[in-house]
Amino acid sequence: MGRNNRHKRGARNKRGPVRSERRPSLTGRVQLHEHSAYVITENGDYKVMGRGKREIMDGDTVAVSIKNSPHGERRAVIEGVVERAAISVVGTYQTAGPLGVIDPLDSRLKADFFILPEDTSADRLGVHPGDAVVARILTYPTRLESGAVTIERRIGGDDAPDLGVQYVMARYGYTDSYPEAALDEAEGLSLDVSAALKDPLRRDLRDRFVITIDPVDARDFDDAISLERTPEGGYKLGVHIADVSHYVAWDGHIDLEARHRTTSVYLADRVLPMLPERLSCDLCSLRPDEDRLAFTVDIELDAQGRVRHYDPYPSVIRSRVRMDYDGAEALLVRAGAVEYSMLEGAAEDVEAAEASREEALERGLACEEAARGYNVDLGDFLVAANELAELRRRIRRARGSVDFDTAEIRALLDEDGVPVQIVARERSCATSLIEEAMLLANECVAEWLADRDIEACYRVHEDPSPDSLHGAAVALAQLGIIDDRRAAGIALGSPDELQAAVDAAAGTANAPLVNTLLLRSMQRALYKPRNEGHFALAAPCYCHFTSPIRRYPDLVVHRVLKLQLAYEQLGGKDALVRTPRLIGKGRESLPRILPQICRACSDAERAADAASHATQKIKIAQYYEDRLGERYAGTVSWVSSMGLFVRLDLTQVEGLVSIKSLGNEWFEFDEDALTLTGADTGTRYELGQRVIIEVSRVNTTRGHLDFKLIH
């Protein structure tokens, strides 16, 4: 039996009054809405009662007690703020007598923020009334007092294109600047190949044919591959990763800042790098025709793609060709290894796509010509790599790996940061080719470390919870994607049934919805000091090894791997000499603080993903600001007490048809079936329903799209 709530122009509970009482204190995360606030706890989500809203901000961790309201609703009473999420606020500067006032850009904030009379930050930075600014919070608001801030920087007028992005950066505590001490340390670094090769662990691979394949607009290249067919019909795959650990010493200025950031953050209009550009875009970037230090994993596989042997070691490489994914795919199509998908849509869109493919082929042919200078047929190289990728994908599928087919929706911006197009970057044969190589290298390194019982930053993906799987199974069955037998298998966590559901929806209008439903039922992957396996990959051992330029856990893995190699191949005395630079010594050494590092990396990854998503939503909202009143076809992708979320066919962008806009009748929300049903007319809205909407309103600060249902 579904848990039902009845709604008319918003949420409302029809149960009678019950006795009000406080329940024991809980902690949770604040989630602000336009006219309400919720606390998300392990025990459920609770709406915040009126008092206390002034002192909380989105993302804060708070202590609450749960109180039954006179209408029977369980409400959260704020007992105190445990941890603040934001250290800055973005808003418009105004004056009120001797005080400066910051009017927050986030209309959900109920508190005021003042600049004290003695604060000269506005004059010092040339800020005038009406300017948008980033202000650092000095004291947080309470129920009785406003917050105090000081201006850190002027953004510009309130119509600045990056105003929303600056808001997100302030919300998550991100900055464009990098500490001077770390920058100075980076400028003092240099590459000395001769000195590096004196290390007996490092091997010279500069005579090996190595290539990089990345997005066409990539600026840093931290992974490369080499591949040879063996006489027995198998493969020798080399995965070569930038050797960041050679340059970044434990507890140095760069390391401390990288450990604080833990990840590069990819916002819609900029990248906030984990490492200084001197490293990420220069010394550690595997650019063509330049000697670079790398960490290599050589993997020998048989003709069926099964691993027979692997060997990790530091190296020196020289990339010969820099390819992009589209160019690589064009060569694979030309070789007959794969086919392009059929182009659909308006004539001008098809024409533009065809032109793009022709340009990609030209880039691919230029790379092919460069490879001939090394007596390598690049087409054959890519065909072999594609064959191996397909073999590895089959092996993963056979052992229970689940491949979710999701597209990355992003806004393309002009040089001023104004969105000009919405694109969906989907997986291609070329991206899969590299992805499979990186997955395999990660597995091999994790197994190498786990076999020796070595602690590191392992990537752990736990089994999904039965409750989450049950909800997804019910929704998929209602969509007609799966039958009852398959639903039962999904509810039990069968990887085969999960993959079958993804495959059944592939190529249909429901494919994005199915993938979203199943992804929501998964646990989030975490970093842990001990290996616990990876559910989605069906991998007994897994870690991140392949992106130390942008992920701190990868740098940790490189360090412990290099130290263990020294111990095994050169002896304990040599390893002892390397220890301070690689992992430190004493109370603040890597082994002592590894659990904290793993937790910090997991938390920072979650925040970076959220910030990236938020800025893309902002740019997408800016794109649709000029398209108010336009109508589009879409699919109901989610149903809640707030209304219907609709994903547009053309761009895969999602917006809300609020329950207020559906009419004046009562709507009954079935939380289990995920439906809204009109009490008077019986009109029913459900997942997967095809609709036509009109863009009715946009919020470019928070990246929200409001739709009006047409039919």
What are these regions (language model features)?
Residues S69-P70, T139-T142, G157, V244-H246, ...:
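Conserved nucleotide-binding/hydrolysis micro-motifs of P-loop NTPases
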